[in-house]
Amino acid sequence: NIANASPIADMPPLLMILDASVVLRKGKERREIGLQDFYLSYKKTVLRESEFIESIRIPKIEHGHLVRVYKVSKRFEDDISASCGAIWMTTENGKIKRAHIAFGGMSEIPKRALNCEKALEGLAWNEETIKLGMEAVRNDFSPITDFRATKEYRLQVSQNLLLRYFHELNNPSANPVRIASHA
């Protein structure tokens, strides 16, 4: 899910917003690189010949931080994402102190939405600010159209996931509950 460099892998967006790094190993040699620097281009990584991912390091986050991951696909189970988003924001005194946002399926590699993050940080935690972030996402990605989704759909989904995150955190009792009829 990480080493094959698929742009629609589910784990990389989450690991990116958590500032995870990968420990790469070849024989006895090891090196550590941030996951957001691991991907170079479509299906290309910084992995050298005979090197492999030995481990993933995730910094500890403080209790109470709310991270959300969303997978959007045509089918409920066993499907490859049309888009996958991971969002983690921290607030202080009613303002967004830190925004970490990443998407898969929005470009040739999974990546952070850096323009969106910058547009949100320091502003009030409200729907108007989130809508500014939704517009800023347009500057982060140039999605493609393929058999899973159109580029317009992918862009709209990424914007809607930001708004969904805001509403879920503002109204925790409204969080959806999914009940499956199987184990």
Where are these regions (language model features)?
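C-terminal structural segment of proteins
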Residues: 1-183
